[in-house]
Regions:
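Glycine-rich "substrate-gating" loop/helix at the edge of Rossmann-like oxidoreductase active sites
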Residues: 134-136, 166-174, 194-205
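Active-site Tyr-X1-5-Lys
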Residues: 133-161
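Conserved Rossmann-fold NAD(P)-dependent oxidoreductase catalytic core, especially the SDR/UDP-sugar
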Residues: 89-138
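NAD(P)H-binding glycine-rich loop region in Rossmannoid oxidoreductase-like domains
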Residues: 38-39, 48-89, 97, 115-117
Length: 225
């Protein structure tokens, strides 16, 4: 496929940087939209801005063929305004900029938290509904944002798709495994249940590859999570 211009929000983060790396390997031009131009993958250009500022987002996305919207505020604790400002308003700004500038493809990084309702999920798939009541500001803001992304599919020629990777780990992981290992070393790692509980985790390479495949097959995947 011909080289394209891609914008990656959160492209200096753990998953975002791996997506940027994959795009650069393909020969694409890559712009990283981030609050700070730190840890910029070599070969990418930086556009510093705030997702909550429509002008910042619009300026970054202008001229892009594809946008990977990876940036988000994650976590269980924190002010509602912060989660909704970054995750929902920020996503609305990304969608508006895609429509404004005629972007062809939008790949959104969501989370399985959008369908979690306290009960265990065994063999769950894309047909799971959003819960009646969300357990965290994070889950609610991401679900509402995902909904906006999927509703934008087909508007002004935009093709949009959402992915829900869970607990991303791998080389350079700044959060998940380091915390687990640190708690284990301190004897603070708690077992929940009888020890047979399972949790799905996603290697960062697989998560990045999934984003590139979503772009490659977006004519089939568009409008879906």
């Amino acid at each position: 496929s011909r080289p394209m211009k891609a914008v990656v929000t959160g492209g200096a983060g753990f998953l975002g940087a791996k997506i940027v790396e994959r795009l650069l390997e393909r020969g694409d031009e890559v712009v990283v939209f981030s609050r700070k131009p730190n840890n910029l993958p070599a070969g990418a250009s930086a556009h510093v801005g705030d997702l909550r500022n429509q002008d910042d987002v619009s300026d970054a996305i202008k001229g892009a063929d594809a946008v990977f919207h990876v940036a988000a505020k994650a976590g269980v604790w924190g002010p509602r305004d912060e989660f909704f400002g970054i995750n929902l308003t920020g996503t609305r700004n990304v969608v508006a900029a895609c429509h404004q500038h005629g972007v062809r493809d939008l790949i959104y990084t969501s989370t399985p938290s959008v369908v979690f309702d306290r009960g265990g999920i065994d063999g769950g798939d894309e047909s799971l509904p959003y819960p009646k009541k969300f357990l965290t500001h994070y889950a609610e803001s991401k679900a509402l944002a995902e909904n906006e992304v999927l509703a934008a599919d087909g508007v002004s020629g935009l093709r949009a798709v959402s992915l829900r990777p869970h607990l991303i780990w791998g080389h350079g992981d700044p959060h998940l495994l380091p915390r687990v290992l640190e708690r284990a070393r301190r004897g603070k790692l708690k077992q929940v249940g009888d020890g047979r509980n399972r949790v799905d985790i996603t290697h960062v390479n697989d998560a990045a590859d999934a984003h590139l495949l979503a772009l490659e097959y977006i004519d089939r995947a568009a409008g879906n999570a």
